[in-house]
């Protein structure tokens, strides 16, 4: 089972519950998990072809007419519609749901498909949710479609779960593991790697707290401060390019709030787009596997 499959099945259930729910794809019905939706709801399924910008603009128009459009699209392809994301969706605060597949390092799909630019977090009024498990994808998509207002993006990776199967509920920030020496702040598919890193460090006598962000934009300042209370040394781990991503925004937030953070180490994709390679290979090369994150904690404590 994959995140794409779980998305498609969940959206079909939501469409059964609310006739306003519609699905949009840009020539990627199979890849995004929408083939079942298209068969069950042919009049509520729209394929705009290889025209992601048009898909966003069309979703905005549908939202203005009272529908609930869900645009399922690969992260790297949605970049083409950035102007429409701002002008035809965010500017008017329209309730469009973006189901953003292939976020982060994608491995087998190749270097053109990496979703490592955190561009959605820069759009005013955009809420960005980041599930780390199938259960979280189900509940986050349900909330995004039926309970939330304005533009919402649910970002999830290629493939299946990485070992973490929890469900954060509607919390924006969750402490998954207590610790006193340092904190690892992460989100999405890297959650399990962070938990494994904390286990490795425990064997060395290092107590690492693991803080999971479920909503990566806007950041929940009060929730983050509560989660990091008492810890002064922090590692932020994410499979995104560093510029404008969670790590940089977290650092600015903690500084602005005077949280007393003594040292922050950012573990990210860095400043260069990832090359070809498997997910395991690329995580290891970038220091985003369990051992790499553990090493970042050692550095922040040095």
Predicted regions and their residues:
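Glycine-enriched alpha-helix->loop->beta-strand junction motifs that scaffold or abut catalytic
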Residues: 41-43, 63
